[in-house]
Curated annotation (Swiss-Prot):
Protein name: Protein Rev
Gene it is expressed from: rev
Function, in words: Escorts unspliced or incompletely spliced viral pre-mRNAs (late transcripts) out of the nucleus of infected cells. These pre-mRNAs carry a recognition sequence called Rev responsive element (RRE) located in the env gene, that is not present in fully spliced viral mRNAs (early transcripts). This function is essential since most viral proteins are translated from unspliced or partially spliced pre-mRNAs which cannot exit the nucleus by the pathway used by fully processed cellular mRNAs.
GO molecular function: RNA binding
Region of interest called Disordered, as start-end residue ranges on this chain: 1-20, 165-213
Organism: Jembrana disease virus
Nuclear localization signal and RNA-binding (RRE), short sequence motif: residues: 80-104
Amino acid sequence: MMEEGRKEEPEERGEKSTMRDLLQRAVDKGHLTAREALDRWTLEDHGPPVHHVKLGRSNTVSIAECARGYRPCRGRRPARRPPIRRHPSFWGTLRGLVSEAQRRQEDRMSDLENRMAELEERFEDLALVDSGGKNPAAPAQSVSPPSSNPFAYSLSHFSKSKRVDCGEKGNRWGRPGAFPGAGISELDWIESGDGGDERPKGGRYPRGGNTPS
C-alpha cells in the first residue's frame, strides 16, 4: 500500500506540472490572462497557483521586477526607501536653530517674570493704602481704591457726578423720580440695596411711568 501511494505521487506531480505548464504557455502566448489562468487552476482543484503561475506583462508588480526577470507573484509590495542621509552641516544648522529657539523662550520667560515682579510691587503698594485713602508712605502715583472696601472708589466717583432731578413724584427709593425714559443713577442703585432682579433692563424705566409696573 505504501509503495502504491508512493507511485501515485509522481504521477500527480506530473499532472500538476503539466497543467501549470499549459496555463503558463497560454499566458505567455496571450491566449489567457493571468486572472483567467488562476481561475481555471482553481476550478480544476489543483491547489493555489499563486506561487507557480507567472503573471503576464499587463499584471506586472513593478518595473523593477520586470527588469530582474521572472519572479513568482507575491502581491504588491512597496519599494524599500533608502535611508535618508543628511549632510553633516545639516545637523549643525539644526542645533543652531534649536538653541536660538531656546534662547528666545528664555528671554520671554525672563520678561514675564520681570513683569510679574513689577505687578507684585504695585499690588503691595495698593495694599498699603488705608481705608481713608491717605498714606504718606505710599508713592504719590499709586491711586487706588481702599483694600477694605473695593467699591469705595466707584462710590466716590459716582457721588461726584452731577444728578438732575426732573420730576416731583418720589420713586420707590424715596427720591424724586426722573422723567419717563430717563436713566437711573448707579449710586442710587448701589446705596438702595433693594432687589436686583426688579431693576429695569438697561437701567431705564418703561415709558409711561416713573416706577416699574
